[in-house]
């Protein structure tokens, strides 16, 4: 039996981080977590990390698609914060963002790590951006690091 696994060490690989500006007071912590994991765990240099800001989570898939089409990056990390309000807007934004990012990954054969928080409250978002529940931005970066190496081995 052959087992294929990827390490989380990927010096020389190039990563694009696409981040939504909406709810930036939380998103900035996700970004810091992602960059920290890429550099500390992945051995990725600053020169191999590009950060692209977009207005909101709905714009993440289009920016990711444009980045993927350029074929200059080994993985994309999508970050954002969508907090449920009193309208169905949350479900539309969260669902379309997730679906669009998955489509980019499959269409362009590139890992697109989903680090978009979809929470019921601001408190839950804060907990997942570096406090009680860890940093989901950092976790998305770890997933991107591992997938880059897994795909290299397949």
Curated annotation (Swiss-Prot):
Where, by residue number, does 5-amino-6-(D-ribitylamino)uracil bind?
A: 22, 57-59, 81-83, 114
- EC number of the protein: 2.5.1.78
What does UniProt give as the signal peptide span?
A: none
Keyword Transferase attached: yes
Keyword annotations for this protein, in alphabetical order, are:
Riboflavin biosynthesis, Transferase
Pathway given for this chain reads: Cofactor biosynthesis; riboflavin biosynthesis; riboflavin from 2-hydroxy-3-oxobutyl phosphate and 5-amino-6-(D-ribitylamino)uracil: step 1/2
Q: What protein family does this chain belong to?
A: Belongs to the DMRL synthase family.
The name under which this protein is listed is 6,7-dimethyl-8-ribityllumazine synthase
Q: Which organism is it from?
A: Pseudoalteromonas translucida (strain TAC 125)
